[in-house]
Amino acid sequence: MEEVPHDCPGADSAQAGRGASCQGCPNQRLCASGAGATPDTAIEEIKEKMKTVKHKILVLSGKGGVGKSTFSAHLAHGLAEDENTQIALLDIDICGPSIPKIMGLEGEQVHQSGSGWSPVYVEDNLGVMSVGFLLSSPDDAVIWRGPKKNGMIKQFLRDVDWGEVDYLIVDTPPGTSDEHLSVVRYLATAHIDGAVIITTPQEVSLQDVRKEINFCRKVKLPIIGVVENMSGFICPKCKKESQIFPPTTGGAELMCQDLEVPLLGRVPLDPLIGKNCDKGQSFFIDAPDSPATLAYRSIIQRIQEFCNLHQSKEENLISS
């Protein structure tokens, strides 16, 4: 192919030959026809790599700021409490990687081994990978277009040496973007268990979650369920509950009923969650009996039950 624009969407992109940057490119017709696209060998390589990963869970949200990364981190912490369970946490929020901070791993670097990139470990059974580990400073801005993000996700899925893993948790950016399309495409043949969608109770968040649910259905991504985060505040002294974000349209419960998706649970606001995330520590350690911790544990149990059922169905399909 001839010289292409710097901001080319890529011959394999859905926007190939159709995007604004394609105007005037000598390869526009070729890309629009699909003739410029070539089979991506990485899909088979990733499928092979993922054979050592038992369960794969995507964590999604319609909006930023609803606690998606906090949930991903505490899902990983909760599952890793069983020392015999191996957990991998992959942060593909390329432009806003917050997992290194939440997991207490800021300043850590990625190391190369003979079998690929080595994850950074919080515990012996909890490994983490994030683009944040590749930045010289946490304040560095990542200003990448779709093809470069796609390449980074491909490299994470293909080249990170997780070893034998029970749960791979993928923390995604908010919304439905290139990153979501890439990870679903690359893991399509590796059998994703499903997605957990995080929301807050108010309608301004729920309206984007409806779009997220429609996205999952369009790309045939199973929905494990919805978590309503910041669902009320329980006063630690009087135990009275206050609605900080009022569910003016019925909250996640009514939305889940209307769209026929499971509501996994509600996590109340707790100031300790934010404090512990800033310190890079698990909230469960400091507040083992708080309403938020108990809600998390119930949700984690339901996710495990879903994954075990999904695994049984996969095994039955293979045996038949």
Swiss-Prot record:
Record key words, sorted = 4Fe-4S, Acetylation, ATP-binding, Cell projection, Cilium, Cilium biogenesis/degradation, Cytoplasm, Cytoskeleton, Iron, Iron-sulfur, Metal-binding, Nucleotide-binding, Nucleus, Phosphoprotein
**Protein's cellular compartments:** Cytoplasm; Nucleus; Cell projection; Cytoplasm, Cytoskeleton, Cilium axoneme
Q: Which domain of life is it from?
A: Eukaryota
For [4Fe-4S] cluster 1, which residues are the binding ones? 8, 22, 25, 31
Which prosthetic group or cofactor does it need? [4Fe-4S] cluster
Give the record's GO biological process terms.
cell projection organization; centrosome localization; intracellular iron ion homeostasis; iron-sulfur cluster assembly; negative regulation of centrosome duplication; protein localization to cell cortex; regulation of cell growth
Positions that bind ATP: 62-69
Q: Which residues bind [4Fe-4S] cluster 2?
A: 235, 238
Question: What are the Phosphoserine sites (modified residues) in this protein?
Answer: 319
Q: Do you know which Pfam families this protein is assigned to? A: ParA
Keyword Phosphoprotein belongs to the record: yes
N-acetylmethionine is found on: 1
Q: Which InterPro entries match?
A: AAA+_ATPase, Mrp-like_CS, Mrp/NBP35_ATP-bd, NUBP1/Nbp35, P-loop_NTPase, YlxH/NBP35
Q: Supply the SMART domains for this chain.
A: AAA
Describe the function of this protein.
Answer: Component of the cytosolic iron-sulfur (Fe/S) protein assembly (CIA) machinery. Required for maturation of extramitochondrial Fe-S proteins. The NUBP1-NUBP2 heterotetramer forms a Fe-S scaffold complex, mediating the de novo assembly of an Fe-S cluster and its transfer to target apoproteins. Implicated in the regulation of centrosome duplication. Negatively regulates cilium formation and structure.
Q: How does it assemble?
A: Heterotetramer of 2 NUBP1 and 2 NUBP2 chains. Interacts with KIFC1. Interacts with NUBP2. Interacts with the BBS/CCT complex subunit CCT1.
- For this entry, the protein name equals Cytosolic Fe-S cluster assembly factor NUBP1
Q: Which organism is it from?
A: Homo sapiens
Annotated gene: NUBP1
